Amino acid sequence: DKIDPVHYAQKLDIRPWTVQVGGLVNKPTTFDIDDLLKTMPLEERVLRLRCVEAWAMAVPWTGFVFRELLKQVEPKPEATHVRLETFYQPFTAQGQLAFWEPWPYVEGLTIKEAMNELAFLATGIYGHPLPKQHGAPIRLVVPWKYGFKNIKSIVKIELVNYRPATFWNTLQGLEYDFTANVDPRIPHPRWPQTQEKMIDTGDIRPTLPYNGYGDLVAHLYS
């Protein structure tokens, strides 16, 4: 049900909002979201979004390149991965009351993925600030990966020297791979990934490796 998030997300208070960036860095910093909006080099990018459930769309995001934030904290050489964490407010987001699920939502990238030019932190969509249901006030956009990797409402970014445990990979690892690159050759256990349905037109199209961004990211996996 895609209507539920629109309703329930409105309970989330997104001001004040800070993003704590630390771990294996020389300059751990807590950033206020409004300071980031004033100081980071914002740009608009139209990027494809491919859900693991085989629907897709193109989205005009506003935000900045992830590595521009990471440069400010100076990652240490031993950092191999980036762990991202969303808010934990179970009485606001009542799904988080499910004690058998590994809340808060966590995702992770390799440091090479996070430093790639295509990895993006979005603060806006369609020319407006992110709505709460889309991950306000700041979310990850990694368009060569399935949508569940694009963590929303980020509060913490930690550079680590291990592969972090992530929400869906922990919950159902056979269905949700940690790397989760879009790949038509690898089916989901319950459906193929060879095709995708465009959510705006209903058109059925072939799935492209890396969601069409192979020229920019395939070298990360060679």
Can you say where each PLM-predicted feature lies in the sequence?
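Structured, non-membrane catalytic/scaffold regions adjacent to prosthetic-group chemistry
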Residues: 1-222
